[in-house]
């Protein structure tokens, strides 16, 4: 059985709560397109939650999405605090997750090598 620290467990709960907000369409800002919450890192004192997201699109679309998410931070903070039942309301920061794009790039390169080598 794996043991998780409290910040990790709270991060998982925050990720699920924000996912529900997105699924239910409660973030109505048109700048926020189809995004996926890839992870949440919570500070040890539970006062800060860094939310990582990924999306397809151009750099301009990512910038607009970031603006929309930044504008929705207060709403997300209130909803997360209520859903996760926390005494402290964590400050929420949204960060684009570059690792998804890097993973796609690595997959593409591996496929190219496979084709060239005839695997």
From Swiss-Prot:
Tell me yes or no: is Cytoplasm among this UniProt entry's keywords. yes
Q: What protein name is recorded for this chain? A: Ribosome-binding factor A
Q: Which family does it belong to?
A: Belongs to the RbfA family.
Give the UniProt subcellular location, in the record's own words: Cytoplasm
Q: Which GO terms describe its molecular function?
A: ribosomal small subunit binding
Q: Does the keyword Cytoplasm apply?
A: yes
Q: Which InterPro entries match?
A: KH_dom-like_a/b (IPR015946), RbfA (IPR000238), RbfA_dom_sf (IPR023799), Ribosome-bd_factorA_CS (IPR020053)
Assembly state and interactors? Monomer. Binds 30S ribosomal subunits, but not 50S ribosomal subunits or 70S ribosomes.
HAMAP family for this protein: RbfA (MF_00003)
Q: Which keywords, in A-to-Z order, does the entry hold? A: Cytoplasm, Ribosome biogenesis
Q: Which Pfam families match?
A: RBFA
| Protein purpose | One of several proteins that assist in the late maturation steps of the functional core of the 30S ribosomal subunit. Associates with free 30S ribosomal subunits (but not with 30S subunits that are part of 70S ribosomes or polysomes). Required for efficient processing of 16S rRNA. May interact with the 5'-terminal helix region of 16S rRNA.
| An annotated GO cellular component | cytosol
Q: What is its main location?
A: cytoplasm
One example of a Gene Ontology biological process annotation: maturation of SSU-rRNA
